[in-house]
From Swiss-Prot:
GO terms for molecular function: DNA binding; DNA-directed RNA polymerase activity; protein dimerization activity. Residues 243-328 are annotated as: Alpha C-terminal domain (alpha-CTD). InterPro entries: DNA-dir_RNA_pol_insert, DNA-dir_RNA_pol_RpoA/D/Rpb3, DNA-dir_RpoA, RBP11-like, RNAP_asu_C, RNApol_insert_sf. The lineage of its organism: Bacteria, Pseudomonadati, Campylobacterota, Epsilonproteobacteria, Nautiliales. Homodimer. The RNAP catalytic core consists of 2 alpha, 1 beta, 1 beta' and 1 omega subunit. When a sigma factor is associated with the core the holoenzyme is formed, which can initiate transcription. The keyword Transcription applies. Residues 1-230 are annotated as: Alpha N-terminal domain (alpha-NTD). One of its GO terms (biological process) is DNA-templated transcription. The N-terminal domain is essential for RNAP assembly and basal transcription, whereas the C-terminal domain is involved in interaction with transcriptional regulators and with upstream promoter elements. Keywords: DNA-directed RNA polymerase, Nucleotidyltransferase, Transcription, Transferase. Belongs to the RNA polymerase alpha chain family. This is DNA-directed RNA polymerase subunit alpha. HAMAP family: RNApol_bact_RpoA (MF_00059). It holds the Pfam family RNA_pol_A_bac.
Length: 328
C-alpha cells in the first residue's frame, strides 16, 4: 500500500569489501531516488581534494644551485631526478608531525629506489619507485623536506616556505589514487525506485581507504555543521527611496560648508542620491576631501536619517533612474 512520507528514508546498510591491497568497494543503500548522487558526488570531490597525505616539498643537493643543474656521477640530471622523486610516496612514522627534514648520502655504483630512502623518520610506501643511477664517481648528499598537506600545491607557493638553498617542488599531497562511484537501482519492499551507491576507493598506502573515507566524511560534516547552529534572520531596513524626494534634490539642500560642497561638485556629485550611491571608502578617496569634511557630510546625512553604503542594487538603480529624469 502506498504511503505519503513526511521524511525521506535514510540508508541502513553498508557493506565494505577488499578488492586488493589499499583498495575497497563500498555498498551503501537504500537511498531515496536522487539522494545517492547528492551524497556520492561531493564525497568523491572531498576524497580527492581534502584527504591529508605527505609529499616532498623541498630538495637540496650538495653542489647544486637549481633544478637545471647536473650531479657528477649521476646519469639523470636534477630535473629528471625531481620528476622521479615525486613518484616516491613517503609516510611519516610519527603521525603527529607535520613535516620532517631527511638527510641522505649515497655513493656509487648504485641504482636508487624508493626503499633506499626509508629510515627511522619515514616509511616509503612505493619502495620500487626508481630515482637515479649512480656510477663509481658519484657522491650524492641531499636533504629532502617532507610535508603533510591536502590537495595539490604548486612550487611557486612553496618557494617562500623553504630555507635558503632548497629547490621548491610541486606537491601532490592526496593519497587517494582512485575514487569512482556508480548509482544502482535497488529493490526495497517491492519498490524499485530506491538507489545504492557503489564506491571504489584506492589509496597509495599512506593511509588506508577506510581512513581516507572517514577523513572525507569528517570534512563534509564540518562544512555542514554551521547550518545546525541557531539561525538569526535579520531584516533589511530600506530607506524608503521611492517616497524620499530629498534623494533627488541638489546637494545645496544639505547646507554643507563651501570646502565640502566644492570637493563633491568637482567629483561630479550634484545630487544627494548620487552621494548615497557611494561607499565610505569611495567617499574618502575623493580628492582634497579631508576627515573634517567627511565627518561633516556624514553628520548632515545622519540628521536626515540617511546612511551611506546601505542601499540594495535595486534601490541604487531606482535612484539613478530618477536622477536622470531630473537632469533631463
Amino acid at each position: 500500500m502506498n504511503k505519503i512520507k513526511i521524511t525521506p528514508s535514510v540508508p541502513t546498510h553498508m557493506e565494505v569489501e577488499k578488492i586488493k591491497e589499499n583498495a575497497i568497494r563500498l555498498h551503501v543503500y537504500p537511498y531515496e531516488s536522487g539522494y545517492a548522487i547528492s551524497v556520492a558526488h561531493p564525497l568523491r570531490r572531498l576524497l580527492l581534494s581534502s584527504t591529508a597525505g605527505y609529499a616532498p616539498i623541498g630538495l637540496k643537493i650538495e653542489g647544486v644551485q637549481h633544478e637545471f643543474d647536473s650531479v657528477r656521477g649521476m646519469l639523470e640530471d636534477v630535473a629528471a631526478f625531481i620528476i622521479n622523486l615525486k613518484n616516491v610516496r613517503f609516510k611519516l612514522r610519527d603521525s603527529e608531525q607535520e613535516n620532517v627534514t631527511l638527510e641522505y648520502e649515497f655513493s656509487g655504483p648504485k641504482e636508487l629506489f624508493g626503499k633506499d630512502f626509508e629510515n627511522d623518520l619515514v616509511e616509503v610506501v612505493t619502495p620500487d619507485a626508481f630515482l637515479a643511477t649512480l656510477n663509481e664517481d658519484a657522491e650524492l648528499k641531499m636533504s629532502i623536506i617532507v610535508q603533510k598537506g591536502i590537495g595539490y600545491v604548486p612550487s611557486e607557493m612553496i618557494r617562500d616556505l623553504l630555507p635558503q638553498g632548497y629547490i621548491p617542488l610541486d606537491a601532490f599531497f592526496t593519497p587517494v589514487k582512485k575514487a569512482v562511484y556508480e548509482i544502482e537501482k535497488v529493490l526495497v519492499e517491492d519498490n524499485p525506485n530506491y538507489e545504492k551507491i557503489v564506491f571504489d576507493i584506492e589509496t597509495d598506502g599512506q593511509v588506508d581507504p577506510v581512513s581516507a573515507l572517514k577523513m572525507a566524511m569528517n570534512v563534509m560534516q564540518s562544512q555542514m555543521e554551521i547550518f545546525t547552529n541557531d539561525i538569526e534572520v535579520t531584516e533589511t531596513v530600506g530607506q524608503n527611496i521611492e517616497n524620499s524626494e530629498i534623494f533627488y534634490q541638489p546637494l545645496d539642500i544639505l547646507d554643507l560648508s563651501a570646502r565640502s560642497y566644492n570637493c563633491l561638485d568637482k567629483a561630479g556629485i550634484k545630487y544627494v542620491g548620487e552621494l548615497l550611491l557611494m561607499s565610505n571608502e569611495a567617499l574618502k578617496s575623493i580628492k582634497n576631501l579631508g576627515k573634517k569634511s567627511l565627518d561633516e557630510i556624514q553628520e548632515k546625512l545622519s540628521e536626515l536619517n540617511i546612511d551611506l553604503g546601505k542601499l540594495s542594487d535595486q534601490e541604487k538603480e531606482t535612484i539613478l533612474k530618477k536622477i536622470e529624469q531630473n537632469k533631463s
